[in-house]
């Protein structure tokens, strides 16, 4: 069975897809609203990149599981 947990840096706690997506939406909203310093913008952007990677890992894992299930179903049919 394939592990579907995202690969993250050791200091990053595991986070669900939904939590990562929700936090990413909040970050994008803050960045789009403006009025924050360059340093804070860069910090938010870096966090957003990490969250986007986590979301992509979850989606890749889900895609692999679906493809495996389809393959199993196709080989099981007479």
From Swiss-Prot:
UniProt-listed Gene3D superfamilies: Exonuclease VII, small subunit
EC category: hydrolase
Domain of life: Bacteria
GO MF terms, alphabetically ordered: exodeoxyribonuclease VII activity
EC number: 3.1.11.6
InterPro entries documented for this protein: Exonuc_VII_S, Exonuc_VII_ssu_sf
Reactions mediated catalytically: Exonucleolytic cleavage in either 5'- to 3'- or 3'- to 5'-direction to yield nucleoside 5'-phosphates
Compartments, record wording: Cytoplasm
One Pfam family matching this protein: Exonuc_VII_S
Gene Ontology BP terms: DNA catabolic process
GO cellular component, one term: cytosol
Keyword annotations of the record: Cytoplasm, Exonuclease, Hydrolase, Nuclease
Primary subcellular site in the record, as a coarse category: cytoplasm
Function description: Bidirectionally degrades single-stranded DNA into large acid-insoluble oligonucleotides, which are then degraded further into small acid-soluble oligonucleotides.
Subunit structure and binding partners: Heterooligomer composed of large and small subunits.
Family stated for the protein in its record: Belongs to the XseB family.
Protein name per Swiss-Prot or TrEMBL: Exodeoxyribonuclease 7 small subunit
Organism placement in taxonomy: Bacteria, Bacillati, Actinomycetota, Actinomycetes, Propionibacteriales
